[in-house]
Amino acid sequence: RGSNLTIHPLRNIRDIFYVGNITIG
């Protein structure tokens, strides 16, 4: 996942936001 962070940073941030949404909701 480290390489993914460098290649697709927006995708990684979106994934974190998605997980955070599930945790909050």
From Swiss-Prot:
Q: In which tissues is it expressed?
A: Placental cotyledons.
Subcellular localization: Secreted, Extracellular space
One Gene Ontology cellular component annotation? Answer: extracellular region
The principal location of this protein is secreted
Q: Name one GO biological process term.
A: proteolysis
Q: Which residues form a coiled coil?
A: none
| Keyword Cell membrane in annotation | no
Under what name is this protein listed? Pregnancy-associated glycoprotein 74
What species does this protein belong to? Bison bison
Lineage start: Eukaryota, Metazoa, Chordata, Craniata, Vertebrata
